[in-house]
Amino acid sequence: MSLREPVELLDPSAVGPVYFIAIGGAGMSGVARIYHDLGVEVRGSDQVDSANLRDLASLGVQTWVGHDPSHLAGARTVVVSSAIRPDNPELVEAHRLGLRIWHRSAALAALMLGREGVSIAGTHGKTTTTGMVATMLDCAGADPSYVIGSPLAATGMSSHLGGGEAFVVEADESDGSFLQYPSQIVVVTNVEADHLDNWGTPQAYFDGFVSMATRPEVRYVVTNADDPGAAELACRLESTGTVRVVTYGESEQAEVRLVDLDLNGTTASATLVYGPTQGRLELQVPGRYNLSNAAAAYCVGSLLGISHQDLLTGIASFTGTLRRFQLVGRVADVSVFDDYAHHPTELRATLGAARRVVTGQGRVIACFQPHLFSRTRDFAGEFGSALTLADRVIVSDIYPAREDPIPGVTGELVHDAVIAAGGDSRYVPDKQDLPEALAEEVRPGDLVITLGAGDVTLVGPVLVGLLEGKA
């Protein structure tokens, strides 16, 4: 199904019972939960059991492990994600029965009808910025609804149905989902070519952001003045005069400026200047990139009428989202972190933050699992260069996600690129071997970080267990 054109949306109360294929996924489970909280009958299945599946079942949602056409009995609407293949037996049955079939983005867009929609978009930083906005509004008493791609560390929740006017969503550009959301406020953290397997060319990818930002209901577009792609988008939009553009960043041209940055270990702070108003932005998460994300969140809150001090207080309470520089454990003076970074720019930002956390003779050891064959093919050299920010690199084979293999494309391309860029790398293709390989490498004072959008996240807890056994 094409996501380049908006689909007809119906009020959520008119579409049930709703059946979610792959209901246990990070994105799907959050949407399913809000439909359930609205009183819509929700059911769904997934290939494997998971905490998300069990959480939904505990709420009374009927769930199955495994896909079977019989599960669709009584359903009126079927919700799928881009990861669902056309030959999925439940999707085939939905077509045969003539049921309404919505992409996840349409199901989420329907929830935003009648609300003050806020879409957080950008190649990098969407999840964290969405989490910051949700936390900030909640602390200010605005009780927002939100759907985030990863659970908030403080609550373990990736979605919430609030009683306030604001509905904040992480707007994914990878498959064109962000074109569906009816939003009055749009944030673009950055624009850097990615997902070319779907968009084809960098220009088409950029034009997708233009299309999202020029939907008829958009009133404000918040853009990062420090990012070339977002700055180009701002210029394009300002020339049309159809929306109000608000810029943020360290640039002197930014409307909301960050100055006097302090990047200190696992925290960060800066002075935020907005016209005659200024105050200290204090974060519990590390990195220059997170200060940028916080400035974006501040802009959104200001546009929604939240006071300056409430904004600073709310953002200061944000403790992160899962899989974003998340501490897995500390054993024998070895720190183990996990991060979702899966693009060269994200690797550079995350490893840069890691270097500021490690102290003394400690090393940064990066364990990277490339995500998608097409992305590995397109960015192998850039991955290699970015990973040289680590003192030691272990590269695993590719997590395929939705893609079929591409001949000659393996994780070894990234390993070779690290070596070519002057880095120190080891290729361990089987992810089952990664915990032991890392345990052999570490010494007191080291920081280990697993990196990637796939199942490399499972490595950290196993590594911590191995290190505890040796302690």
UniProtKB/Swiss-Prot annotation:
Its EC number is 6.3.2.8. One of its GO terms (cellular component) is cytoplasm. One of its GO terms (molecular function) is ATP binding. It comes from Cutibacterium acnes (strain DSM 16379 / KPA171202) (Propionibacterium acnes). The keyword NAD does not apply. HAMAP family: MurC (MF_00046). This is UDP-N-acetylmuramate--L-alanine ligase. Keywords: ATP-binding, Cell cycle, Cell division, Cell shape, Cell wall biogenesis/degradation, Cytoplasm, Ligase, Nucleotide-binding, Peptidoglycan synthesis. Its main location: cytoplasm. The gene is murC. It is found in: Cytoplasm. The lineage of its organism: Bacteria, Bacillati, Actinomycetota, Actinomycetes, Propionibacteriales. The keyword ATP-binding applies. ATP binds at residues 122-128. One of its GO terms (biological process) is cell division. Cell wall formation. Belongs to the MurCDEF family. It catalyses: UDP-N-acetyl-alpha-D-muramate + L-alanine + ATP = UDP-N-acetyl-alpha-D-muramoyl-L-alanine + ADP + phosphate + H(+).
